[in-house]
Amino acid sequence: MIPGRMNSREMRRLMAQMGIKSTEMDDVKKVIFVGKEKDYVIENAQVTMIEAQGVKTFQVVGDFRETPKKQEGKKEETFPEDDIKLVMDQTGVAREKAIEALKAASGEPAQAILNLTQK
């Protein structure tokens, strides 16, 4: 232990005495903060949730980057990969055609499959 500093075990003990809980959130890989003009993305995130007096605070460490917002008029639809693969497998069409069919069917895979097989 370095003179004048506490080791991590001692720090955790003192925090517990003060009613502060610290929890590592190991399953988090990415954190995104959505802003008005930009999004702030933290990849390979290490997140710690600290709870004190009923208030939860998050500490995030990782690779930071900013991304500009996409144009609102150019909103691109995205569909779950499972839905796209299902349409492709059931109808034998290419990926682009499956996505077009999902767009026409408002994202409903069953309707997209019916539309493609009835043509």
Swiss-Prot record:
InterPro entries noted in UniProt: NAC_A/B_dom_sf, NAC_arc, Nas_poly-pep-assoc_cplx_dom, UBA-like_sf
GO MF annotations, alphabetized: RNA binding
GO biological process: protein transport
Entry keywords, A to Z: Protein transport, RNA-binding, Transport
Role played: Contacts the emerging nascent chain on the ribosome.
HAMAP family reported for this sequence: NAC_arch
Family: Belongs to the NAC-alpha family.
Protein name as it appears in the record: Nascent polypeptide-associated complex protein
Naturally occurring in which organism (per UniProt): Thermoplasma volcanium (strain ATCC 51530 / DSM 4299 / JCM 9571 / NBRC 15438 / GSS1)
